[in-house]
Amino acid sequence: ESWLQTLELMKMYDRWFSQQELQVLPFAEQDEQRNQTWLELVSEAQQLMRQRCPADAPQAMALATRWMEQLEQDTAGRPEFLTRLNEMHAAEPQMREQTGVTPETIDFITHAFAESKLAIWARYLNAEELAFTRQHYFDRLMEWPALVADLHRACREKQDPASTEGQQLAQRWLALFQSYAGTDPHTQQKFRYAMAREPHLMKGTWMTPAVLSWLQQATGALMRQAQGPAA
């Protein structure tokens, strides 16, 4: 039965990824150790959900962090693979049956991972700022992977951060950032300060130093443009 399931999974990957992509997608390789790791992660998530474990419990946040780190590794750090896997999970009932990863599991992990970040931001933000972030963090969360995939592509293609395309990407990033950080420059500075000091905040973002550097150049150009020529 297990080889039949493996065959079925391989067929599914063939439907969603090109042969070239499959060669670099760790998930598509049949690796016993990786399969075992995911089996344990899913089993742990199911157990915590059965126990009605709150998303902000230490064990839930620790599991979500391990899950996201493994996911980033097994998608070869490529956010476009993540968006495709999400679509594949939503469209293929057999995928959910074989992996045991249900929409409820994903929801639990997403919330627990968010709580792990909110716990850090709580050290930098005041009560009002934190309440705003907590209230709005999930508003546009699902838009991030597609944006990060576009940022990776722009960086890979060596697009000029100050170009029209670069500025459009910077505007999209700023809109998503402000959706949970608000528009107060003083508050936004607290987020930037925290992100520079707390490695955990960069986990599960699929952002590399090169992509981050490109984005900083693009947002810098956007800010200069918004300020207009110096008087």
Where does each model-flagged region fall?
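Amphipathic alpha-helical "stalk" segments
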Residues: E1-A231
